[in-house]
């Protein structure tokens, strides 16, 4: 009995250590998924007509902001070594029109990057990457991905409130 207990405890310890191995990636994935989910909820709450609304000339419209998020997801993943899936042309994303098409493109990019977060290995987190706007390690790239989605969630909340749209999680 004592040997079984020791074996079970050893197995538990090994499993716990492995769970900690990807703690940073799992935490980032969780926060990123939450931000992405709320951005999609906001995207769905806007009417088709509101997708063309912009706070001022020269500022991104609702639809443009959503497509920017989708495009940036692919861009950041690409810089970390994960090219976009077959059939996705990053340069064509800004040309997508229509609420349903924009939401579909956003959801596809969200799913893609969530799948890639856990593929970044611990021994790669310190590797330097030139993102074009900054040089940082892959950990910084994962954090930038999470922060960027959160930044535009805030932008879209302001857009929603300006148009009388209540964020669905605030009701």
Where are these regions (language model features)?
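Short, contiguous alpha-helical
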Residues: 29, 33, 37-40, 48-91, ...
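A short, mixed-charge helix-start or loop-turn motif at secondary-structure junctions
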Residues: 21-25, 91-99, 135-139
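Short leucine-rich amphipathic alpha-helices used at interfaces
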Residues: 21-22, 28-30, 72, 79, ...
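Acidic/histidine-rich alpha-helical segments that form the ligand environment
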Residues: 95-129, 140-148
């Amino acid at each position: 009995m004592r040997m079984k207990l020791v074996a079970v405890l050893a197995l538990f310890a090994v499993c716990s250590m492995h769970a900690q191995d990807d703690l940073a990636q799992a935490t980032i994935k969780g926060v990123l998924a939450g931000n992405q989910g709320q951005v999609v909820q906001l995207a769905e709450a806007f009417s088709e007509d509101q997708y063309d609304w912009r706070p001022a000339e020269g500022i991104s419209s609702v639809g443009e902001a959503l497509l920017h998020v989708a495009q940036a997801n692919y861009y950041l993943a690409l810089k970390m070594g994960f090219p976009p899936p077959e059939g996705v042309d990053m340069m064509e994303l800004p040309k997508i029109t229509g609420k349903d098409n924009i939401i579909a493109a956003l959801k596809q990019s969200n799913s893609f990057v969530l799948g890639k977060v856990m593929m970044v290995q611990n021994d790669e987190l310190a590797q330097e990457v030139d993102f074009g706007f900054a040089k940082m390690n892959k950990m910084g790239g994962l954090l930038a991905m999470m922060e960027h989605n959160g930044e535009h969630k805030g932008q879209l909340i302001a857009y929603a409130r300006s148009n009388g749209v209540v964020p669905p999680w605030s009701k």
